[in-house]
């Protein structure tokens, strides 16, 4: 006997003698035995083959093929029982093969006909029915559970693959049934791509998804190789027997170069009069999913359109029956179940031919439970039982799996929204119960209901595949570079995820490599992810579209900005409930009414959760007003009669005793959300400033030791020197955030700060002053919290130095004009070369060249500047704006309200019509005569009749995660649609230009917006030639130098102040403006414009400077809430403004709403729901981070 081939060395030789394996030889020329059934082979039928190493003389290999040794190769020494491996006490008494854990070989094809053409099938051991005591024997590659063992993971090499005879050239005619070993070009034994194991899907067969392999249901037929699909030269389908058979077989598993056409057609064509044998729907190498690739009638998929189910004609003398795949070669039944095969089809022959049998009985017979149990199913059941938790297999094994009809009925009874998706109708966009934590939900109610309107579609992948079956044919479309196999199938050197590690008996939680390891489509080599920018775009990058899912990076950003506020709200809730209990009030009643106004009837503040309401009307009181009204509750109960139902009106008032304590969300749900949020904080190292996070160890019971070690590790104190080393400043900047968050007991353990000389003290103090509050950029005393070990003299010197250098730091940080940042080069010149962005110096503005910047660069830079309260200029919007929608010809037909704006007062309505306004828009000589000290404006809200403009605006908005109504970082997207969102609708503003000699006028007076604002300049008139010189002189006289460059069409000038300077500006306006003109109320129209002289006085006398932004057509200016700003149009312009609610300014917006008494009712209704929007956003963020690995 020849030696074992090189590609078989080191592989386990699983061989048994013929009696052990249940192989019964068949003499040549003997007639077939009774009881043989063709079609898909049942898992219990005997077969003499495993991995190409045979023990019988009449092997399936061609003559002369090297045979393996007779003795069985022992297992690897030192390997104990692992997941899926054999148990000696269980398998010791069983006949047949002994099992070792098997893994999928990528991408081996376990599909093939049970009896190829002119093949003499193997004889089973028994001629009767399917006995349960049959020993285990397998036909090559018909069983998807005998796979390559883990021993083959040691080193990559060519793995022998068994191919059907019609794909191998040179097969001898005396062995027409042989399935020779052939090196498969796609097979590798290194790290395997992540494929859900065959054992995890139960009776649905194995599930394989590989984007590099052509798909049967969606890919066109022309994309495949004609020789592989059994096509002739003309591209038409070829029937069996029309092509010549191969004539040469190469030794050592090498394929001949002159391979003939494939005689087995891949797809079944139209029925023919010539009888032919049914063949598999995909050859080896095209592995598909039994449950969701085959298309049914009406699906429109290619797999069904190519031909109807055919009735094959097998060499067996039995009558033909309809084949239904039990292996991956055959399509399942329409209901998604698997049909009978082999011996299991014996009992269905009579029932399948009769047409009068009920369909339910046919479904029962053709379901996956029709196969009687055997030794192999016991093996599979045990394996599934062990791994049911890992692979989320319901109830452990397929024998107890419910049929699809019963499962749908159960879901329908339970009110599951998946029934609608399975039956074909779309699920509702917003569930009927959007308020979690009601009495019906109980524990865990905060995360049971997910708001689908904000793109939070949480679908369990395991249940999704199990329930939808063949209707979810596109569920396997994922990133072609990510691995698709479970962690247990990875090489031993790679770490496993937490669930896989626990299943293997290991401890600790490891991050799964499925999100970090990529593979080449055909090479089969694993490589570590190196492009962090590409990887972060899917995890941390912003999502676009109303139905996109919240990414991990955005969830962290939401939680870091809103978590502290939610903690304060929850603490206020606990205090309110504790006070109500002390007052003797009953338990709070949970109310579930989405349309009720969440506003206090007395102070018009927002209602978060706990409040008092009248059970007979809509009268409600917040916590503060409820306490005031509850002081006389005891007196009312003692001496006064309670209010009757007839007297319950708004005019008559409500007695305190008639109000009832009410909640929108139960206290239990809020407590669970608070616990989950703090655990996510600890898990992702998100820093919070709430008192609850002072000791984070209480929120992480399993990681108490690690948290203790992390709190003990403090950064070393930098050693200052007198030589002015720049590295010292850098180290202090990097370590200051960490040291500022350390607990007091850890700071006390540090030694005294080394300050041996006055020079070192001055240097360290100056650095601390420059690292003051980010939003203020000014010195303050004391600069840092006093340390227990600090000397009193050191604190006094810090205060003195802070007072001396405070004004200089202010002037440097709040310098006038537009400073050169990473996106600018001297004003409005050309942008800088594309280099890695760096954090700009304090006071510099950000100019984004792209409306949707890269997640790792421009987007994070915007968040940094936006967090500091700075405006941002965005260019490049003109590429998406449609000029025909925003021109004067298109806008002239629209109506609008014309207003006259003066420098000292709010805009006043004008008697001019919109047609007259648009006639003088581009021609000053045609403009109506008006006061020299006023400018005409036109305002219009874009409503339903402006659908095309609204859609174009939505597609052109910069940073849609913030500015768009469905943006994940826009808190308005977490509120239900209604009248409350009306203040956020886009507004159209058109204004005449201000001539250079009228610099004291503006097109928008100084005002403060309650919400964040984005203003896009959609159209600007061309300035006259005589204005260029005057315009240049006017721009050169603005604050700062180099703000204007020749060639750029500057249309508007923005002056933006910091929100912290609003109070100083109010006091300055009260001094320089007439009575009533200096008011700067939030949300009210501006009543004063600051010209160059007033801005200079404000800077010199009050130390308040402003940023100057020059806006051109196709650019947008983003202004944070609370920042005073004014606009001056140099030419006639048309702009569109839209408000949004960002997490960074949500707290300031709520505060400004209470300070603005002149806000319209719609604005009060919007900002009254800010706390509820914060709750919804935090709930979605916590749910996303809990599911993240």
From Swiss-Prot:
Which residues fall in a compositionally biased region of kind Basic and acidic residues? 239-254, 457-469, 725-736
Protein's name in the database: Lysine-specific demethylase hairless
Q: Which Gene3D superfamilies match?
A: Cupin
Q: Which disease is it linked to?
A: Alopecia universalis congenita: A rare disorder characterized by loss of hair from the entire body. No hair are present in hair follicles on skin biopsy. Atrichia with papular lesions: An autosomal recessive disease characterized by papillary lesions over most of the body and almost complete absence of hair.
Enzyme kind, highest EC tier: oxidoreductase
Q: Which GO terms describe its cellular component?
A: chromatin; histone deacetylase complex; nuclear body; nucleoplasm
Q: Which domain of life is it from?
A: Eukaryota
Tissue expression profile of the protein: Strongest expression of isoforms 1 and 2 is seen in the small intestine, weaker expression in brain and colon, and trace expression is found in liver, pancreas, spleen, thymus, stomach, salivary gland, appendix and trachea. Isoform 1 is always the most abundant. Isoform 1 is exclusively expressed at low levels in kidney and testis. Isoform 2 is exclusively expressed at high levels in the skin.
Q: Which organism is it from?
A: Homo sapiens
In terms of PANTHER family, this protein maps to:
JMJC DOMAIN-CONTAINING HISTONE DEMETHYLATION PROTEIN (PTHR12549), LYSINE-SPECIFIC DEMETHYLASE HAIRLESS (PTHR12549:SF4)
Q: Which cofactor does it need?
A: Fe(2+)
Q: Which InterPro entries match?
A: JHDM2-like, JmjC_dom
| Zinc fingers classed as C6-type: ranges | 600-625
